């Protein structure tokens, strides 16, 4: 079952207790085990266990007030139905195994009556929508009929929105209504719809208007997680300069001691730590500097806090826009030390970190060789850093005809600390170069950086097949900027 994580550490039987506030009956699930799971973000976690009697009846004890939110009752299969535990309500619900959600009867609980009435309403609207879609396909060659169907389709959306708003107005103090209201996106004012840019910024600034960021219950529903993911990865323009202030403004609206703050900071940090979009690791570094180093991440134990800070600090040196250290390594003779700043004068340098035994490196290297051999212009050099310094390295270079600056660290530098120290004190190289895996955050190969004439990082973690397109776009942008400055 999607997203359900259970830690089944329990013993003994859980009997049906008449005084329990949450009572259920599932016809068709007699004499079996049932689990209660709580949402935290998008995932479900084990919360409690019950056993059904001969009629499929069972119950759960009351939860703590600080654990209110959306839950799921999980039956064998596994199959489950959702419910809301909030506002101190007693709950009485019954259904059957033929359709746990569709056949649900809510006998007691305003919140769950709200939720299941809404589910039934949406199900009916979905059927209407599907019919309209089919009619639209049948009438695609009849403009007038198609336009009429589109209008009906738009009316359906308006009806759903009106229903959602009405529920909120009718039940202002019920979490079930608040959860439905959370799913509504803010509507851009009519006067701004014609101005795309103004409309976008209004929408971004008001994105969380329908969510009470002071209510910790929202992190125990999947809706807040979904809204947060959409905001971070789609709503806000995907550059550090726009993301960082938007994130800080959002978090500033939260109580630092709240579950909402904890969830938002934790997920946002993880999201950009694992992002595949080039340059967004800067957002991860900002999150660690702002919320972890300052002692605000009180939920982190000492070891985990130390690890995330170390990881962030390692990434700082290789953020987009940073000038790299003067990487200076030895060629295949082990005698000539080549500096990317002192000895290479080309406008651009591609740093290519690889391992001759790495399977992916074996595939990418010939592509890089082909790209370089057919590259038009003399403004590019490739500084290829091998993790191996043996004959295997030389064979790899010869086999692939790598007409690059082929460099590595001589074996003796690994074997003798005195030798390594002399290399530094005599100016042959530097500490950052001998520790280049740490300096450039190399935890897997191949790894690519594109540097400009000042050896500033302009691109990183891209594929070999992307280098050419990136350089073309970068040169065009630089040319336009230069022209604009001259004018």
What spans do the regions from the language model cover?
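Bacterial Sec-dependent N-terminal signal peptides
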Residues: 1-25, 460, 478, 484-487
């Amino acid at each position: 079952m999607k997203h359900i994580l259970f830690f089944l550490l329990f013993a003994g039987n859980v009997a049906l207790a008449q005084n329990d506030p949450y009572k259920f009956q599932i016809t068709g699930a007699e004499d079996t085990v049932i689990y209660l799971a709580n949402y935290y973000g998008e995932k479900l976690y084990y919360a409690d266990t019950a056993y059904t009697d001969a009629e499929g009846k069972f119950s759960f004890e009351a939860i703590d007030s600080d654990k209110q939110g959306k839950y799921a009752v999980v039956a064998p299969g596994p199959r489950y139905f959702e419910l809301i535990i909030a506002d101190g309500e007693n709950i009485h619900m019954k259904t059957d195994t033929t359709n746990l959600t569709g056949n649900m009867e809510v006998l007691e609980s305003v919140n769950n009556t709200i939720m299941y009435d809404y589910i039934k309403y949406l199900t009916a609207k979905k059927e209407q929508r599907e019919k309209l879609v089919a009619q639209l396909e049948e009438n695609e060659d009849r403009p007038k009929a198609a336009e009429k169907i589109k209008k009906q389709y738009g009316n359906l959306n308006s009806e759903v929105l009106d229903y959602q708003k009405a529920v909120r107005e009718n039940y202002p103090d019920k979490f079930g209504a608040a959860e439905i209201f959370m799913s509504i996106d803010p509507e851009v004012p009519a006067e701004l719809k014609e101005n795309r840019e103004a409309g976008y910024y209004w929408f971004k600034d008001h994105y969380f208007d329908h969510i009470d960021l002071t209510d910790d219950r929202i992190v125990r529903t999947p809706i807040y997680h979904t809204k947060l993911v959409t905001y971070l990865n789609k709503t806000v323009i995907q550059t550090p300069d726009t993301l960082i202030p938007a994130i800080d403004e959002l978090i500033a609206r939260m109580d630092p001691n709240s579950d909402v703050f904890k969830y938002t900071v934790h997920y946002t940090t993880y999201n950009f730590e694992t992002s595949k979009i080039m340059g967004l690791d800067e957002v991860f570094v900002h999150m660690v500097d702002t919320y972890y180093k300052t002692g605000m991440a009180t939920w982190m134990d000492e070891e985990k806090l130390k690890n995330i800070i170390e990881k962030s600090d390692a990434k700082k040196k290789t953020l987009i826009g940073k000038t790299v250290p003067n990487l200076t390594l030895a060629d295949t003779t082990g005698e000539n030390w080549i500096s990317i700043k002192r000895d290479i004068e080309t406008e651009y340098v591609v740093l290519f970190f690889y391992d001759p035994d790495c399977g992916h490196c074996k595939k990418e290297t010939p592509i890089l060789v082909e790209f370089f051999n057919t590259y038009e212009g003399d403004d590019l050099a490739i500084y290829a850093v091998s993790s191996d310094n043996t004959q295997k390295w030389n064979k790899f270079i010869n086999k692939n005809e790598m007409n690059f600056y082929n460099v590595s660290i001589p074996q003796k530098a690994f074997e003798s600390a005195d030798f390594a120290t002399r290399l530094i004190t005599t100016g042959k190289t530097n500490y950052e170069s001998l520790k280049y895996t740490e300096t450039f955050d190399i935890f897997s190969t191949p790894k690519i950086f594109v540097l400009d004439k000042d050896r500033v990082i302009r691109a990183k973690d891209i594929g070999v097949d992307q280098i050419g397109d990136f350089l073309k776009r970068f040169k065009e942008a630089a040319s336009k900027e230069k022209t604009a400055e001259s004018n």
